[in-house]
């Protein structure tokens, strides 16, 4: 094997060894054993919330361990591939090309796994609460907000992460004014928090009779889901509860009872709505979870020197954009912070955003070290 390839394999081995140490593979195996024991308890499903948490954590831990073990097995097999290529004779060139392709693919997969070790923030391990709001751009902006919502939900589905939609406020003509949903997966907050900010879309408007180019904006906010250890207690007298009928696209009612709930936190003026559950009680519980997350954000912001610690600065306008999605006159999605770009917007809008997430996490880590 050539010295350059030996050096590449040695470098990958060093990186993967560091990943195995930081992620504590032995501890991960012990955690899986503990969760499997909990999952085998016949009484587990008496508590639906606990059962879902245990099974979700178990699935994630098993997937993480399987991914690391597969990377180690592939790395161990790589020198053998090069040895076999050298013995191929006439087919040596093709076999060598296959080994080089595996080396390249393995490097990308190990680097992607390495990103997970950078999620060490106080709340990074939490599930994520995502809110999307349409900004400047009229009906195109509302449509753009709905496209972003679909993008994140598709990303979650591709990773088999459960998504729970709490509220969707539909615009009159098309799209949404806002939406709030949770991504139930460990480290969802640490991963998706780099998506906070204003996302800009440039395209030929499907709503313009003259087919003119339109620029639209939408804002993405990502918060950590609140846990009992956060001690976010809300006195009953601090919250005003209003109920109303759920509405769908175009403002049409989708429920004959007043099941939708609007919570107003009187001391701060924070307003939260939830209408996606079937009962008023379920909507109230979900809305309270969102309100707690927003109050946690407010608490953290007050404790930090920079107000944008959890929330992107400013509103949905040109000067605050963090990523640009151009569909016309050319095809490009570019992150303005990391310079990471992709020439296939269709794939990105269908949930293929891991490259942007990894680049964003590395960018944030460098910023924190400065």
Swiss-Prot record:
GO cellular component term, pick one: cytoplasm
Post-translational note: Methylated by PrmC. Methylation increases the termination efficiency of RF2.
UniProt subcellular location: Cytoplasm
Record's keyword annotation contains Transcription: no
Keyword Transferase tagged: no
Keyword annotations of the record: Cytoplasm, Methylation, Protein biosynthesis
A Pfam family assignment: PCRF
Residues modified to N5-methylglutamine: 252
PROSITE patterns in the record: RF_PROK_I
Gene Ontology molecular function terms on file: translation release factor activity, codon specific
Function, in words: Peptide chain release factor 2 directs the termination of translation in response to the peptide chain termination codons UGA and UAA.
NCBIfam families associated with the record: prfB
Protein family membership: Belongs to the prokaryotic/mitochondrial release factor family.
Protein name (Swiss-Prot/TrEMBL): Peptide chain release factor 2
Native organism: Mycobacterium avium (strain 104)
Gene name linked to the record: prfB
């Amino acid at each position: 094997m050539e010295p350059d390839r030996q050096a590449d394999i040695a470098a990958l081995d060093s990186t993967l060894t560091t990943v195995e140490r930081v992620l504590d593979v032995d501890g991960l195996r012990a955690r899986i054993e503990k969760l499997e024991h909990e999952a085998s308890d016949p009484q587990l499903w008496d508590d639906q919330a606990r059962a879902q948490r245990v099974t979700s954590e178990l699935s994630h831990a098993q997937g993480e361990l399987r991914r690391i073990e597969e990377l180690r097995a592939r790395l161990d097999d790589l020198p053998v591939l090069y040895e076999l290529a050298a013995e191929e004779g006439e087919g040596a060139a093709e076999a060598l090309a296959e080994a080089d392709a595996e080396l390249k693919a393995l490097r990308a997969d190990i680097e992607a796994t390495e990103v997970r070790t950078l999620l060490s923030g106080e709340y990074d391990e939490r599930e994520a609460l995502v809110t999307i709001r349409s900004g400047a751009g009229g009906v195109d902006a509302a449509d753009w907000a709905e496209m972003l919502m679909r993008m994140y939900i598709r990303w979650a589905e591709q990773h088999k992460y459960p998504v729970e939609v709490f509220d969707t406020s539909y615009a009159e003509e098309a799209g949404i004014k806002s939406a709030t949903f949770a991504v139930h997966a460990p480290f969802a907050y640490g991963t998706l928090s780099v998506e906070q900010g204003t996302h800009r879309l440039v395209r030929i408007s499907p709503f313009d009779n003259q087919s003119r180019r339109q620029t639209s904006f939408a804002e993405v906010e990502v918060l950590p889901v609140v846990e009992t250890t956060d001690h976010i207690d809300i006195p009953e007298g601090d919250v005003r509860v209003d109920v109303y009928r759920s509405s769908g696209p175009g403002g049409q009612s989708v429920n004959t009872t007043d099941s939708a709930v609007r919570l107003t936190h009187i001391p701060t003026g924070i307003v939260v709505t939830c209408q996606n559950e079937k009962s008023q009680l379920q909507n109230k519980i979900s809305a309270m979870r969102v309100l707690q997350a927003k109050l946690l954000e407010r608490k953290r912001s007050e404790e930090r020197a920079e107000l944008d610690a959890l929330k992107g600065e400013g509103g949905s306008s040109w000067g605050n954009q963090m990523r640009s999605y151009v569909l016309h006159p050319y095809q490009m999605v570019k992150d303005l912070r990391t310079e990471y770009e992709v020439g296939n917007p269709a794939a990105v809008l269908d949930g293929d955003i891991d490259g942007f997430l990894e680049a964003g996490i590395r960018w944030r880590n460098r910023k924190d070290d400065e």
